[in-house]
Amino acid sequence: MTSLHSKPLALKNVTVTDSFWRAEQELVRTAVIPYQWNALNDNVPGAAPSYCMHNFKAAAAQNKRKDTQGKAFVPPKYTFRGFEALPEDPANPDPDKFYGFVFQDTDFSKWVEAVGYSLAHYPDPALEQTADQAIDIVCAAQLDNGYLDTCYILNDMDRAFTNLRDHHELYCLGHLVEGAVAYYQGTGKDKLLKAACRFADYVDERFGRKPGQLRGYPGHEIAEMALVRLYEVTGEQRYLDLAEYFVTERGRQPYIFDIQADENAKRDADANYKPNTDPNRYAYHQANKPVTEQDEAVGHAVRAGYFYSGLADVARLADDQDLADAAERLWRNIVDKKLYVTGGIGGTVDGEAFSYNYDLPNDSAYSETCAAISLAFFARRMLELAPKAEYADVMESALYNTTLAGMALDGKSFFYVNPLEVNPYACHKDSRLRHVKPVRQKWFGCACCPPNIARIVESVQEYAYTVAEDGGTLFTHLYMGGVAKAELNGTAVELDVTANLPWQGDGKAVVRLGGDAAGTSAQAPARFTLAFRLPGWVGDESAAAAAITATGESESGADSSRVTREIRDGYLYLTGEWRDGDTVTFDFPMPVRMLAANPLVREDAGKVAFVRGPITFCAEEKDNGANLHLLHADVEALLADPSAAKVEEFDFHAGAKGIDDKGQGEVEDVTRRMVKLEVPAWREPLPAAVAAAGEGAAEVPAFAPLYAVYAPVKREPATATLIPYFAWANRGENEMTVWLRG
C-alpha cells in the first residue's frame, strides 16, 4: 500500500504562469481578498454583516479588561443558546457582545489562508501588514490556556465543549490551523501558527480515550484534515494521533451528542426536551456508525467532504488499509450515484445534504460551492493514497465548474447554491426554491463559500502535482502552465510547463536538471519517472496516451528508447535517463461529448448535457431566448455527425445591473476569452397567443388550453449556444439550464 502513496509539492515549489488560473488568482488577489476583508469588517454596502472581526475585537477587549481588573473581573453570563446571534439594533451592535453564527471566527481563518497562499508568490507589503494587524487582534482574543473561540469567550467559558454537535469550536480550530499553516508557509511568520498550536494542544489535553478526557469529536468536521496538516508542518506526532482519534471515534456508541444533549437539558431545566431515538439520527453528521462500517455518503455534504478528506489523510499516514477501504467505498458511492455533471455534490436543501442514490434534481439542486470544494479536497487526498486518473478527473471537474461558478467574473458576488436549471420567475415565486438565487449575492451571513473559493483558487497549484513517497516519480494531475520543482532520486528537477487548457488540449513540459544535493553538474542525466494523467474527457485512454510524446523514447543509435512508457490506472509513466532540456509534449483530443445520465436519475431522463475537456456547458436565455425547457438538442444530427457541434473561441462580455436596491447580481464590465459551443437544436413552438404575449408571458394568462389532445410536436430548427457553466449569471438575471431535452 505505501508504495502508492505520494505527497503534494510545497506551495512555493509550484509557480503558476497558466493564462487561465493566473487570471483567476490575480482576480482573487486584487479584488476578492480586499473585498472580503471589507466584508469581514462589515464595510460592504448592501451585504449582510459578518461580525467576524467585531467578535475578535470584543474578545480581545474583554481579555484586556480581565488583565486590568484581575480578580475583580466578572466573566460574562451565558446569554446565547442558539445558532446565530443578531443585535437588537442592527445599526448599533453592542461592542462587547458576540454576533453572527457560532462558527463566525472561521471567516477570518479562511481569509488569512487565502492571503498566505497569495503572499507566497505575490509579495504585497500592504496586504501583509493588514493581515499582521488582524492576526494581532485574533491572538489577543486567545485565552491563557490556549482556547480560541469567540462565541464562548464572550458567552461563559463554563459552557465550552458542552455542545459539540451544534456549536462548532472544533470546526473553528480546524480552520484556524489551516489559515495559520498557510500564512506561515507564505510569509515565514509564526505568530498565528503558535496560537493555533496552543489551541490544538488544549484540545489534545481535553479529548481522547484516557481517563478524565472527553470522548467527543467535531460536530462539523475539518479538524481532522487540519490536524494532519499541523502534524506535517510541525512534526508533532500528537496532532496526527488526535486526527486519527477524531476519525476513528466518530459514530461510536454511546453517542457523545446524546450524552451532551441530556446534560444540557438538565442544566437548563428544559421541560420540553425529549431524547432523539431515531437510529439514523446522526447520519447528518456522518456519525451514525463508525467510519469503517460506512458505505454511503450521507448527511451534510460539506461536512462529509471534509471528513472523508481527513479519513484519507489518516489512512495514508497511518498506513491503515481498513480506513483506506472505507474512503474508497465512500468515494465510489459519490462518483457512481451522487455526483452532478458539474462536479457538485449534495442535492437537497434539506440539511444541505446528500439525498438518496441517483436523486440529482436540477432546479432545486443545492450543490453548495463549499461542497464542491470539499470534493476537490477529498479527490486530492485520494490521489495521495493512490494515483488513479479518476480521482483527478473528478477533482478537475469540481474545480473548473461548480467551484468557479460560485464567484462572479469580477470577484464581487457569490453563489452559495449552484443549480443546474434556473427560471428566475420561479425562484421569486416558489417558496420551494427559496434557496436558489438567480444571481450572485454580495455576501452572506453564513459566508462560508466566498472565502473558501479564495483559498482554493490561490492554492490550486497544490492540486497539480505530487511526488511518490519513494522519491522517484513526479505525478502531473492537472495540466496548467507553470514551473514545478521537485527532488527526484536525489536530483533537483524542474518541470517547465506550458498548457492551453481548458480551451485547448495542447502544451509541453521541459525538463530542467539542477544537480543533486552535492552540487553535481546540472547537465548530468538522471534516472526518474514522470507520470502524466490521461484525462478521462479524451474518451479513450489509448488515444490520450498516444497524444503524449517524450524526447528519448525513440532515438536512433545506442541511446534508442532511453525513456520507456507504461500505462497504469490512467497515468502514463515515462521512466528512464532524463537529460536537461528533454521535452514531453501533449496534444489531447478535446471532443465535444454529449452525455446522458444513468436512467435511474429521473430528472435527466431523455436529456443530454454537453462537456468539452474539463468544462461543462449550459444554455442561457441571453443567447437562446426564454422558455429553455422547449429547447431540444438535435441528437440525431449530432450522432450522425459529431462535428456538427461547433467550437468557437470568443470574448465573453460580463456586466449587469443589480436586480434590487441592495445591488444583488451586479457585475462590473469584464471581458474574458473563452469557448462557446454552437449545437444543432430545435424548438417546440409556443401556442400563438402565448408567443404573442412576448417577454414575461409567464405572468399573463395563456390564451391556449391548459390541456389539449396530443398532437406530434412541431420542430422549429434552431442552434443552441452553450457557454461554460462557471460563466452563467454574469449578464443579469435570466434562465439557464445544463441539461437539454433530446
Residue ranges: model-predicted function:
Residues 21, 112-125, 174-189, 223-235, ...:
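Well-ordered alpha-helical scaffold segments within catalytic/enzyme domains
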Residues 155-233:
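A conserved hydrophobic secondary-structure block that centers on an alpha-helix together
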